């Protein structure tokens, strides 16, 4: 029995201009992660730069049997993440989607 499924992985590189400390950064990152989880059925985690107060790398993952569904989902997540980040004093400096 084989299962055909795809995994989509969105990476967001954030620059957090408003952060003056790690506490400020954590607040922005936590808000972004919580809002994306609540709005979309995705897994979200901070991946890199955990010790730097002005940047963060966020990973977003979803699994589906449909590439079209994943493509639309990840583009919507990316748009929403940009809005949330901008409202929290951060910018999405770079983003990319990978499929496995």
Cite the ranges covered by each PLM segment:
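Short, charge-patterned binding micro-sites
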Residues: 8, 45-66, 98-100
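Positively charged, small/polar-rich N-terminal and surface patches that mediate targeting and assembly
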Residues: 1-2, 38, 88-93
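Residue-level signature of transmembrane alpha-helix interfaces in integral membrane proteins
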Residues: 31, 57-59, 75
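N-terminal first-folded block
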Residues: 3-39, 43
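Short structured motifs
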Residues: 44-45, 93
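C-terminal structural segments of small proteins and small subunits
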Residues: 63-100
